[in-house]
UniProtKB/Swiss-Prot annotation:
Molecular function per GO: glucan 1,4-alpha-glucosidase activity
Gene name of the encoded protein: GAA
Organism: Blastobotrys adeninivorans (Yeast)
Catalysed reactions, semicolon-separated: Hydrolysis of terminal (1->4)-linked alpha-D-glucose residues successively from non-reducing ends of the chains with release of beta-D-glucose
Family classification: Belongs to the glycosyl hydrolase 15 family.
Gene Ontology biological process: polysaccharide catabolic process
Superkingdom of origin: Eukaryota
Name used for this protein in its record: Glucoamylase
Length: 624
């Protein structure tokens, strides 16, 4: 962490010569373990240094301030980075930060806090220092950046239809085969999903709670649609094995973070090395998948007693039935900070909140069906409380849903992360709360996806060999430094690029179901980029029979296919999909045969063919 933050600080804009540094202390204090030494506020950048007593190796030093409106929010804080020793005996260290404060601004420094994690001590210094700006003027934020689209695709394309056809030799068939190759691999505990059969550089030979649930969601959709009795029984067996494996994980005494433990060995015992834990999205996504499986199982004529004994009732059947315990955990822990789905930072995350909300809402109905009315009421109450926190993530100044509601972490100054889009895909509860057509979601999808245009050189290749448009290569977030093996420069990911395709397909479906489109100031940049063939104006409304309605949705569909074509363009003819493709060359990078990549392709294909009204598509894939 220190090394990364140092790199981030070095990459920040240096304090200009015209900036003035205000000194508060020239030497370490005698009566405190932390003290602010100096600060400078210039050109929208806040720089500060502090003396920190060397009480432990694991340290977290945070400076808090109020914004330009003299309000303190979770955004108005910054983590300091180790610079050097500040005393000959190494008992004191000098730490610093250099962060942009645009668009929020700074009014006053409130306090600096030092957590010596390994010894459990917290130290702080109250400041209440009125900040004086010097040097260059604070820039006026231009948010969001308006990009001119490089293409105007429209409607479905035959090449993508052929690539995704329901046959064993298509990419859909290949993806399905490779996905199942990573479930119950030889020697692994039944019900486990290996993230990738990559055992070094990188070592992904583990089962992750979240990833496994997303893969099993695809398996459940196949189960729900299969006509082949042989295939249906196979999927059913795997899903019951998965449920039992989840219960075993819940009860593993070696799990350091208990129910929030994210990662297990293939024998289904907890990984106990250093890791980003807890990850509280996992119990939520597992509950969602298993509730949806339980409902599908009952719809197929399954026994409610079997559902209660092998899926739901964790109190009576703790070794095999995980749903109730997952729901109880989500209800009691949703407000606690946890690590994000990228396993990098601890905060309050939009993705985690949205999947937790869906779990609570689905769980409330399911618990009621199981006769567990007291738990059902509790889940409804907690879902309502969680829902009240979601508006906090919308930043009107940035015109963006923040991926996390907290200070800048790991140098992610843009606050842009594709996890917001993934949150809608995995956590939308079909109740118009942050739906696919929500203006704030559309604005965020536009900002996040276009943010990679200036990051990846491969984005300069905008068409394939036949001249068909390629969608934007999408990574996790623009400041990413994980390169698939180590840290250098981040790359586009297959699953995030295809997630944008699925997002657009599902947006079109939702607009068609609604029968109208209303353009707002917030959503206007989205429409101007992804439906540029219509001269959109804020305040315009298109009804289902209007040509602008039809043209706009055909444009979104065309961009959906363009994003799929981007993934296709960087996929070798063998159909093998890695985690990433190189930001410069476009060659596959990182873990080979990433299970989540195949799940993402299948999920996008299901959304596309549903939009095309291909009612037998999912059944045909399930029966392959």
């Amino acid at each position: 962490m220190r090394q990364f933050l140092a790199l981030a600080a070095a990459a920040s804009i240096a304090v200009a010569d015209s900036c003035h540094t205000f000194t508060l202390a020239n030497s370490p204090p005698d009566d405190k373990a932390v003290a602010l030494s100096s600060y400078s506020y210039c050109g929208g950048y806040l720089s500060a240094s502090a003396f920190v007593k060397n009480l432990s190796y694991d340290k977290l030093v945070t400076l808090y301030w109020t914004n330009a409106d003299n309000k303190s929010t979770p955004l108005n804080a910054g983590s300091l980075d180790y610079v050097k020793a500040a005393s000959d005996d190494q008992s004191w260290e000098l730490w610093s930060l250099n962060v942009t404060t645009v668009p929020d601004g700074v009014d006053a420094l409130l306090n600096i806090t030092y957590v010596a994690a390994s010894i459990g001590k917290t130290n702080s210094q109250q400041l209440n220092v009125q900040v004086e700006a010097t040097g260059d003027p604070i820039p006026t934020p231009q948010i969001p950046t308006i990009y001119k689209p490089y293409a105007s695709p429209s409607d479905f394309s035959d090449d993508i239809t052929n690539w995704l056809k329901p046959s064993n030799d298509s990419q859909t068939g290949i993806a399905k085969s490779f996905l199942f190759n990573n479930i119950n691999i030889p020697g692994a505990a039944p019900g486990t999903v290996i993230a990738a059969q990559s055992y070094s550089e990188p070592d992904y030979a583990y089962t992750w709670v979240r990833d496994a649930s997303l893969v099993m969601d695809v398996v459940n959709r196949l189960y729900s649609s299969a006509k082949s009795e042989e295939k249906r029984q196979l999927y059913e067996k795997i899903l019951f094995q998965y449920a039992k494996a989840g219960a075993q994980e819940q009860n593993d005494p070696t799990a350091i973070s208990g129910m929030g433990e994210p990662k297990f060995y293939l024998n289904n015992t907890a990984f106990t090395g250093s890791w980003g834990r807890p990850q509280n999205d996992g119990p939520a996504t597992r509950a969602i998948t298993l509730i949806e499986f339980a409902n599908a199982y009952l719809a197929n004529g399954g026994s409610q007693d079997t559902v209660r004994e092998q899926l739901y009732d964790s109190d009576k059947y703790p070794q095999v039935a995980p749903i109730k315990k997952d729901l109880q955990f989500v209800a009691s822990n949703w407000s606690s900070p946890s690590f994000d789905l990228w396993e990098e930072e601890e905060s309050a995350h939009f993705y985690t909140r949205l999947v937790q909300r869906k779990a609570l809402l689905l769980g409330a109905d399911f618990a009621n069906d199981m006769g567990d009315h007291e738990l059902s009421d509790k889940l409804k109450t907690q879902a309502s409380k969680l829902s009240d926190t979601l508006p906090e993530f919308w930043d009107s100044a940035r015109q963006l849903i923040l991926y996390e509601y907290g200070p800048v972490l790991r140098g992610k100054y843009s606050y842009k992360d594709i996890s917001v889009v993934l949150g809608v895909m995995h956590g939308y509860a079909n109740d118009n709360v942050f739906s696919y057509t929500n203006d704030q979601i559309l604005a965020t999808a536009y900002q996040v996806s276009t943010s990679f245009l200036d990051v990846y050189k491969v984005a300069n290749t905008t068409s394939d060999e036949s001249g068909k448009p390629l969608g934007i290569p999408v990574g996790r977030y623009p400041e990413d430094v994980y390169d698939g093996v180590g840290t250098s420069q981040g790359n586009p990911w297959y699953l995030t690029t295809m997630a944008m395709a699925e997002f657009l397909y599902r947006s079109v479906q939702e607009f068609e179901d609604a029968g109208s489109i209303i353009i707002s100031d917030t959503s206007l940049p989205f429409w101007k980029y992804f439906a540029s063939s219509v001269d959109h104006k804020a305040g315009a409304k298109y009804n289902k029979n209007d040509q602008s309605f039809k043209t706009s949705l055909k444009s979104l569909t065309g961009w959906g296919d363009a994003f799929m074509r981007r993934a296709k363009y960087h996929t070798p003819s063998s159909g093998h999909m890695s985690e990433e493709f190189n930001r410069t060359t476009g060659e596959p990078r990182g873990a080979k045969d990433l299970t989540w990549s195949y799940a993402s392709l299948l999920s996008a294909a299901f959304a596309r063919e549903e939009l095309r009204n291909q009612k037998n598509y999912l059944t045909n894939v399930a029966d392959l």
